[in-house]
C-alpha cells in the first residue's frame, strides 16, 4: 500500500501557498512547493507527487500549459491535478478541464471543501495503485 502522500503545490502567491501548505500538512501530507509551472515541471521529473494543486496565473509557465504538458505525458497523466484559480468565468473552468485538470476550484475557496477534494483524489489514487499490485 502506498503511504507516500506527497503533494506538489504550485502557487506564486506566498501567502496563499503558505496557508494551503499549513492546511495540507495538518492533514498529514508532505508538501513540496513551486512558484511557477517551469519549476514545478522540473520537480515532477525528479519525484512524482501523488497529487498537484495548481494555480493558473503564474510567471514563466502558466497553469494551463503545465497541466497540458503533464496530462499528455504517459509518465505523469495519472497524477490528479486540482486547479485553484481566481479566474472564475465558465470559459476559464472549461479551459482548465480541457487541459486535463481533474477539478477546477475558484478562489476564494472553502478550505474544508478543498481538503476534502484532495482526500477524495488521494484515496482514489491509492486504491487504483493497490488494485493494480494485487
Regions found by a protein language model. Give the residues of each.
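Receiver (REC) domain active-site loop signature in two-component systems and cognate sites
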Residues: 58
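Acidic, metal-coordinating helix/loop segments flanking the phosphotransfer/catalytic sites
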Residues: 33-51
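C-terminal output helix
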Residues: 109-119
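Conserved acidic carboxylate
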Residues: 11
Amino acid at each position: 500500500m502506498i503511504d507516500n502522500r506527497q503533494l506538489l503545490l504550485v502557487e506564486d502567491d506566498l501567502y496563499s501557498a503558505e496557508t494551503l501548505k499549513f492546511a495540507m500538512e495538518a492533514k498529514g501530507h508532505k508538501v513540496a512547493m513551486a512558484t511557477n509551472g517551469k519549476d514545478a515541471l522540473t520537480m515532477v521529473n525528479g519525484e512524482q507527487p501523488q497529487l498537484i494543486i495548481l494555480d493558473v496565473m503564474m510567471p514563466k509557465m502558466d497553469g494551463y500549459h503545465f497541466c497540458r504538458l503533464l496530462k499528455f505525458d504517459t509518465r505523469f497523466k495519472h497524477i490528479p491535478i486540482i486547479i485553484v484559480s481566481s479566474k472564475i468565468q465558465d470559459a476559464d473552468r472549461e479551459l482548465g478541464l480541457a487541459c486535463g485538470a481533474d477539478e477546477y476550484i475558484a478562489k476564494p475557496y472553502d478550505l474544508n471543501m478543498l481538503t476534502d477534494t484532495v482526500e477524495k483524489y488521494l484515496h482514489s489514487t491509492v486504491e487504483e495503485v493497490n488494485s493494480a499490485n494485487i
